[in-house]
Every structure is written in structure tokens, then in C-alpha cells.
């Protein structure tokens, strides 16, 4: 049985570089014969924070397909931008709307950090790793941190061979993880 992969673009911000990086990663996996699902947080129902979480779990018919997708996934890749020293609140809210503990328990994940700063979202990746470990997910130790990301997308495409090589390395590690 083949494993199911889902790539999560970790922001709901329009025109975010995160989605471009997610597409690059998807291409890398595809070139290695891996079929993926792509989850773009911008496509979530705008009211899901109020209509799909906690006592409303399972009641939002527009959100439920995302819950099923995440439950049926074996391996995850989260492309995570740094916002205000951590990761986007939309991503945390999305995670809170998923079935606990079954969504992530004993599954595998990889994290990629993006930042305008020179830290490459180190704190964001640390915070998210703690959350996923709490949820029982095994996180790949190699976490590319793509700093000053805008400089590598001036042409609208990833123009950093170093960053591309980092993503390839992680993808190959994830396939064998």
C-alpha cells in the first residue's frame, strides 16, 4: 500500500511565498514518484474557527473534507512562514480543528521554515515541533530554514540552488522516514 502525503501551506495570507515553496516541494516529490495532496489554508471556510472547532467538531460540512484528508494522510510536509516570532495563527487554529489524537499519532512529518529575517523561522519550527510531538507525530530532524526568502523569489521562482538542494534532501529523507 502506498503512503499518502499531504503538503500544507502554513498560511492563509494572499500572495504568500509559502505557496510557491509548497509547489516547489510538490514538484520535487512528484519527480520521485510521490503523489501528494496540497492543502492551502486560504481555501478553508472563512468561519471555520467558530463553526468547526471544539463543541462544533464535525458540524461544518465545508471543513469536514479537510479533517478527512488529514486523518487519511500518512506523511505530512508543513511549509511554515514565521509570523511575529512563531507560526501563523491560522495554522494553529486549523490544527485545533482536527481530530485529536488520531490525526497525527504515530504518523510522520517534515517541517520547512520560511522567514524574511536571517533566522529562517527557527522559533516557529521549534514551537510547531513541540505541538506535533505532543500530538504523537514523529518529526523529521532535518528542517530546512529558508531565511531572507524574498531574495530567493525575486523572479517569481525559487532561484537559490542551495535552498532547492535543502528541499530535495529533506524530501528524500522523508520518503525513507
Language-model region placement:
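Fold-independent oxyanion-binding glycine-rich loops
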Residues: 10, 41, 114-115, 149
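A short, flexible beta-alpha/helix-coil linker loop
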Residues: 12, 44, 111, 151-152
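Short helix/strand-capping connector loops at secondary-structure junctions
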Residues: 145-157
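Short glycine-rich loop/turn motifs that provide flexible caps or phosphate-binding loops at active sites
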Residues: 9, 88, 109-112, 119-120, ...
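N-terminal beta1-alpha1-beta2 submodule of the flavodoxin-like/Rossmannoid cofactor-binding fold
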Residues: 1-96, 100, 157-175
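Short, glycine-/small-residue-rich phosphate/pyrophosphate-handling segment
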Residues: 107-148, 162
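Short, conserved loop/helix-junction motifs that constitute active-site signature segments
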Residues: 101-105
Amino acid at each position: 500500500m502506498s503512503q499518502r502525503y499531504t503538503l500544507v501551506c502554513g498560511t492563509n495570507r494572499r500572495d504568500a511565498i509559502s505557496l510557491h515553496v509548497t509547489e516547489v516541494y510538490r514538484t520535487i516529490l512528484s519527480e520521485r514518484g510521490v503523489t501528494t495532496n496540497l492543502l492551502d489554508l486560504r481555501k478553508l471556510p472563512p468561519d471555520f474557527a467558530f463553526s468547526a472547532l471544539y463543541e462544533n467538531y464535525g458540524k461544518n460540512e465545508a471543513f469536514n473534507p479537510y479533517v478527512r484528508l488529514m486523518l487519511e494522510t500518512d506523511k505530512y510536509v508543513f511549509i511554515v512562514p514565521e509570523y511575529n516570532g512563531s507560526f501563523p495563527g491560522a495554522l494553529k487554529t486549523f490544527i485545533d480543528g482536527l481530530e485529536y489524537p488520531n490525526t497525527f499519532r504515530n504518523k510522520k512529518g517534515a517541517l520547512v521554515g520560511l522567514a524574511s529575517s536571517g533566522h529562517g523561522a527557527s522559533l516557529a519550527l521549534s514551537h510547531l515541533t513541540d505541538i506535533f510531538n505532543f500530538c504523537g507525530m514523529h518529526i523529521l530532524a532535518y528542517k530546512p530554514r529558508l531565511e531572507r526568502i524574498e531574495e530567493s523569489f525575486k523572479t517569481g521562482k525559487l532561484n537559490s540552488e542551495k535552498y532547492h538542494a535543502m528541499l530535495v534532501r529533506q524530501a528524500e529523507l522523508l520518503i525513507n522516514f
